[in-house]
Amino acid sequence: MRFVVAVSALALLCAGVQAAAQSRVRLNWGAISGVMSPIWVAQEEGLFKKYNLDLELIHIAATSKAIQSMLSGEIQFTTADALNTIQAFNAGADVVMICEGVNRFVFSIMARPEIKRIADLKAKKIGITRLGSSTHTAVLYVVNKAGLGANDYTLLQLGEVPNILTTLLAGQIDAGALSPPTNSRAKKAGLQELINLGTDGPEYPSTVIASTRSYVKSNPENTRRMVRALGEGLAIFKSNRQIGIRAIQKYARLNDAEILEDTYKQFRDAFDPIPYVSRAGIASLLAGMGEKDSKIRQIRYEDVADMRFVAEAEKEGVFKKLASK
C-alpha cells in the first residue's frame, strides 16, 4: 500500500514538473490569409508543445487593437505590420519585432473586369481593411507609383480581406487589395489583376511577429521557443505541400483545390527560409515615414527589431537542419 501511495505521489510530482515546464502564452494571428500559415502549421503539427509552450491562439484582426492587447499584457505575441509597429514605437510604446512573417507585399490589386490599369482607378472606390494596415500601405504604394494623388480616389475600410472581395463582387467598390487565398478567388471569379505585389512589388516587411521589449527581457526562453516553433512551422510549410495546404484549408475555411494550390504556391515562394525582418525593407520604410515625421529619422533598425533569437538559431544550424528534412 505504501509503495502504491509513493508511486502515485511521484507521478503527481512528475506531472507537476512537466506542467511547470509548459509556459502559458497567447499569440494573435491577425488576418485570414496564407501569410499566417507558419503559425497554423506550428499549431496543427504540435510544434508549440514540442518547444514547451502552452499556447492559446487568438484572432484579433486589427493590428492596432492587437498591439494594445499586447501592451496591456493580455497577449504576449502578435502578428503585425512593420509600419504599425514602428508607429507604435515612435509614439512611445514598448514594442519590438522578433522575427519575420513575410518580407513582401503578398497582395494583388484586383479590380472590376473593365479596369485594365492602375491609372484607371482615378475617381474610383478602393477597398482596404483599415487605414494604416498592410492593405492600405499596398494600395498607397501602387497608386502613388501610378501618379495618383490622395484626392484622385476614395478608400473604403471594410474590416477583413474577404469583405473586400464580397464588396467588389457586389459592385460597391471598383478595386481592392487582396491577399491569398482571396486574390485566387477573385481571379477565378473573373476579376482583373492589376498587379501582383508579391512578385512585382518592393521588399517590405508586411507581416512580422512582435512582442514587447519588457516581455522579451523577462522571458527570453519563451521568446526563443516561440521563434523556433515558428521557424519550424515555416520550414514544414515550405517543404511539405500537403501539410501546408491542409492548414490553409482549415483556418481559411477553403475547399476549392485550385485556390488552395495557388495560395500555397504564392506563399511558399514569398516566405524567406530564415525569418529575419528585412533590414533593407525597414530602412526603406523608415525613410518614407521620416519624410512626414522627422522624429522617425532617428530610429534605427535595432530600435524596433531584435533578431538575436533568429541569429542564434541560424548559428546553431537550426534552419539548415530543418530545410534538409
Predicted regions and their residues:
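Secondary-structure end/capping motifs
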Residues: 217-298
